[in-house]
């Protein structure tokens, strides 16, 4: 938008996905850094990723292409960022990346969950089912007890919020699932 008259200069992004947050506007390089979700087909649309794009809408670049829920922390000069990502059923990974193209500078850490597994922790089961319309994907997880017996019956807690643009199903790794 033109800040003086409020008119649209050009649309920067478009598509069937959501810009969640504008993280930084680099006026000198004419680039915007932002987080978004819903851009990867056949993937849970609530998984957050980070992107950069030029003011004119060209050069859209995914900085965090690895499958997962991402959390990026940028350096003060915005040349690098630490990307920590995971899924409800996959342990966190931390990597250092450069911010221009998202290239990996170096891996930092991968969580070791062997002690959790030894203690009986079971990863949640991620699933996708069709909604009532037969077309809409509904993503969720099944969390089973550590001492799960498939021959027993268990109570089920179904926690659902069917509103737009929000989710309450854990998307990232939580050791207490």
Where are the regions that the model predicts?
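A flexible loop/linker signature enriched in serine peptidases of the S9 family
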Residues: 1, 13-20, 36-49, 65-67, ...
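Short loop/turn segments that connect beta-strands within beta-propeller blades
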Residues: 3-6, 54-58, 99-101
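Long, ordered, helix-rich scaffold segments
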Residues: 6-9, 22-24
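A short beta-strand motif characteristic of beta-propeller blades
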Residues: 8-13, 59-64
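Repeated scaffold domains used in trafficking and secretory/extracellular systems
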Residues: 19-24, 69-73
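Repeat-blade elements of multi-bladed beta-propeller folds
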Residues: 26-35
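Serine-hydrolase catalytic core recognition
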Residues: 29, 62-64, 69-177
